[in-house]
């Protein structure tokens, strides 16, 4: 079994890379790929860079060059669930874009033309992620909708609009749906696991800087426990 892991920033992948046995680092198009073994499985940890285009490029290269059986997206997110706090985890049941609007042509809000409205995370991986969280027992978690866009959300007006458009949204971030779209087109099973670094409000920039490392560590622990259970 070969598993690809994608995180946007160094703090989101550092713990995973440090845990690899026999790591081998390569770069393609400025994107860093670290191959190694984790819990007896072949793993490729990918630091994609921030945003949808960077994530799509990294995912395409990961699948094309390394052919993983599964793709796991890990990292931080802004939370939209009242019962969760910074450091808690959202497991994506599906991912959508919050900044796409081609409704003039009959598509749903957030649906890219000629694409499904949502990119559904693999049920086996979602269940494995839930089991991993239960095994660790360190943080609260929910499984639900994660929305993606090329903006850091800290404006109450924008937050309210997103909640109106996607009332079941559990978290927002900047890569997951792009990764989901590429995996969909390659027919590669995927899941998105995000630890909350902020609550998508006026305090988000301060919270994000303060809690990014904590969120990245929590998310990495979930990923490692998930891989152990596969």
From Swiss-Prot:
Pathway: Amino-acid biosynthesis; L-methionine biosynthesis via salvage pathway; S-methyl-5-thio-alpha-D-ribose 1-phosphate from S-methyl-5'-thioadenosine (hydrolase route): step 1/2. Substrate binds at residues 78, 153, 174-175. It catalyses: S-adenosyl-L-homocysteine + H2O = S-(5-deoxy-D-ribos-5-yl)-L-homocysteine + adenine; S-methyl-5'-thioadenosine + H2O = 5-(methylsulfanyl)-D-ribose + adenine; 5'-deoxyadenosine + H2O = 5-deoxy-D-ribose + adenine. InterPro entries: MTA_SAH_Nsdase (IPR010049), Nucleoside_phosphorylase_d (IPR000845), Nucleoside_phosphorylase_sf (IPR035994). Coiled coil: none annotated. The keyword Amino-acid biosynthesis applies. One of its GO terms (cellular component) is cytosol. The keyword Transferase does not apply. CDD domains: MTAN. The active site is at 12 (proton acceptor), 198 (proton donor). Pfam families: PNP_UDP_1. Keywords: Amino-acid biosynthesis, Hydrolase, Methionine biosynthesis. GO terms for molecular function: adenosylhomocysteine nucleosidase activity; methylthioadenosine nucleosidase activity. Its EC number is 3.2.2.9. One of its GO terms (biological process) is L-methionine salvage from methylthioadenosine. Belongs to the PNP/UDP phosphorylase family. MtnN subfamily. Catalyzes the irreversible cleavage of the glycosidic bond in both 5'-methylthioadenosine (MTA) and S-adenosylhomocysteine (SAH/AdoHcy) to adenine and the corresponding thioribose, 5'-methylthioribose and S-ribosylhomocysteine, respectively. Also cleaves 5'-deoxyadenosine, a toxic by-product of radical S-adenosylmethionine (SAM) enzymes, into 5-deoxyribose and adenine. This is 5'-methylthioadenosine/S-adenosylhomocysteine nucleosidase. It comes from Shewanella amazonensis (strain ATCC BAA-1098 / SB2B). The lineage of its organism: Bacteria, Pseudomonadati, Pseudomonadota, Gammaproteobacteria, Alteromonadales.
């Amino acid at each position: 079994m070969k598993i690809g892991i994608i995180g946007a920033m160094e703090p989101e992948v550092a713990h995973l890379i440090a845990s690899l046995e026999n790591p081998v680092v390569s770069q393609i198009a400025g994107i860093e790929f670290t191959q190694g073994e984790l819990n007896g499985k072949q793993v490729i940890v990918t630091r994609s860079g921030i945003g949808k285009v960077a994530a799509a490029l990294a995912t395409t290269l990961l699948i094309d060059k390394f052919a993983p059986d599964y793709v796991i997206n890990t990292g931080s997110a802004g939370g939209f669930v009242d019962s969760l706090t910074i450091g808690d985890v959202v497991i994506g049941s599906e991912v959508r874009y919050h900044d796409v609007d081609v409704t003039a042509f009959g598509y749903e809000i957030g649906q890219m033309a000629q694409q499904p409205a949502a990119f559904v995370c693999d049920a086996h991986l979602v269940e494995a992620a839930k089991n991993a969280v239960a095994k660790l027992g360190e943080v609260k978690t929910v499984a639900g909708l994660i929305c993606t866009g090329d903006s850091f959300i800290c404006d109450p007006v924008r937050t309210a609009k997103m909640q109106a458009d996607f009332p079941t949204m559990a978290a927002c971030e900047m890569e997951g749906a792009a990764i989901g779209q590429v995996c969909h087109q390659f027919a590669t099973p995927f899941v998105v696991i995000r630890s909350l670094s902020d609550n998508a409000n006026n305090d988000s920039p301060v919270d994000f800087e303060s809690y990014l490392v904590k969120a990245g560590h929590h998310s990495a622990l979930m990923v490692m426990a998930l891989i152990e259970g596969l």
